[in-house]
C-alpha cells in the first residue's frame, strides 16, 4: 500500500478516521505540495451490496460535486490488489462532534455560522439531485471557520422525472428521521433536513435530542417533539427552526430551500 502511494507521489502519515470498510489517513502530496487526506477502501473487505451498489455511487457522486463547503476530491487511484484511494482535501480542525465533545455547547452565533454553511452545502447537493443520507456531526469537518461536508458513502442520485421514495435505511440511528427508522417509503431529501436538525441541536446542546439506545422510545420522543435545556438560553427563533427541522411528519417538514429562508439564518 505504502509503495503504491509513494509511486504516485504520496507519503503516508497517521490514521485520522476509520469507517466500516475504509480508513482515512493523512498524507503529504508531492504533486500538490500540501497535506491531504486519503480514504482507503478495500474492495475485497466489503460485502457485495457495498461493492456493487454503494461504492460505485459514492465514486460517481464525489467526482461531480464542486462546492466550497464540501470536501474536494483531487484524485482517485486503484491498485492491483483491489484497494481504491480517494485523495481529498484535508480539514485540519477535526469534526463538529469532537469540537462539541471537547468544548461543550457552541455559542449560538458560532453554531449559526457553521450551520449556514451546512445549509449551503445541502442546498447545492439537493439542487444537483443528490441526497447525502448520512449527515451527522462526524461528517461535518472543520477548517478554521469553515464547515466542510464529507463521506458520501450512502449518498444517492435521485431520479429527475419523479419524486424519489426510498425504503433503505442508511446512516446513523441517532440522526435518522422517524420515517427512515420505520421503513416507510420516504423522500431522502427530507431525511437530510431532519438529520441537519439533529446536528444543529448537538452543536447547541452538546447532547442528542432523542435517546437512541431504545428505538421504540426514540420514536415516541420524536413524535412528542423536541425540548431544550432552559439554562442554555437558546433564542426563540432558533428553537422555532429546530422544531421545523425536527418535524416528525415529513410532509410538513420544510425543504432545504425553505430552511435557507428561515429568519434565524437570515439574521446576523
Swiss-Prot record:
Domain Protein kinase, which positions? 10-265
* Primary location: other
Q: Can you say where in the cell this protein is located? A: Cell projection, Cilium, Flagellum
EC no.?
2.7.11.1
Q: Name any cofactors this protein relies on.
A: Mg(2+); Mn(2+)
Q: What does UniProt report on the pH dependence of this protein?
A: Optimum pH is 7.4.
Instruction: Describe the thermal dependence of activity.
Output: Optimum temperature is 30 degrees Celsius.
Q: Which family does it belong to?
A: Belongs to the protein kinase superfamily. CAMK Ser/Thr protein kinase family.
For this entry, the protein name equals: Testis-specific serine/threonine-protein kinase 3
Q: Which gene encodes it?
A: Tssk3
Amino acid at each position: 500500500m505504502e509503495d503504491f502511494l509513494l509511486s504516485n507521489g504520496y507519503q503516508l502519515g497517521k490514521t485520522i478516521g476509520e469507517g466500516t470498510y475504509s480508513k482515512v489517513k493523512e498524507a503529504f502530496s508531492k504533486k500538490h505540495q500540501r497535506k491531504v487526506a486519503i480514504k482507503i477502501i478495500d474492495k475485497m473487505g466489503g460485502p457485495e451490496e457495498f461493492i456493487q451498489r454503494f461504492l460505485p455511487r459514492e465514486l460517481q457522486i464525489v467526482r461531480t460535486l464542486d462546492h466550497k463547503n464540501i470536501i474536494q476530491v483531487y484524485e482517485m487511484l486503484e491498485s492491483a490488489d483491489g484497494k481504491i484511494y480517494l485523495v481529498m482535501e484535508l480539514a485540519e480542525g477535526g469534526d463538529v462532534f469532537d469540537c462539541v465533545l471537547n468544548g461543550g455547547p457552541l455559542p449560538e452565533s458560532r453554531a449559526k455560522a457553521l450551520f449556514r454553511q451546512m445549509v449551503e452545502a445541502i442546498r447545492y447537493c439537493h439542487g444537483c439531485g443528490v441526497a447525502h443520507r448520512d449527515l451527522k456531526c462526524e461528517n461535518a469537518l472543520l477548517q478554521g471557520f469553515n464547515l466542510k461536508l464529507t463521506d458520501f458513502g450512502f449518498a444517492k442520485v435521485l431520479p429527475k422525472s419523479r419524486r424519489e421514495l426510498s425504503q433503505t435505511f442508511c446512516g446513523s440511528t441517532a440522526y435518522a428521521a422517524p420515517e427512515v427508522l420505520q421503513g416507510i417509503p420516504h423522500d431522502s431529501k427530507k431525511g437530510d433536513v431532519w438529520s441537519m436538525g439533529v446536528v444543529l441541536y448537538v452543536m447547541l446542546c452538546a447532547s442528542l435530542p432523542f435517546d437512541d439506545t431504545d428505538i421504540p422510545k426514540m420514536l415516541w420522543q420524536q413524535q412528542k417533539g423536541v425540548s431544550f435545556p432552559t439554562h442554555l438560553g437558546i433564542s426563540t427563533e432558533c428553537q422555532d427552526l429546530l422544531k421545523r427541522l425536527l418535524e416528525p411528519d415529513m410532509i410538513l417538514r420544510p425543504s432545504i430551500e425553505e430552511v435557507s429562508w428561515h429568519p434565524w439564518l437570515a439574521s446576523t
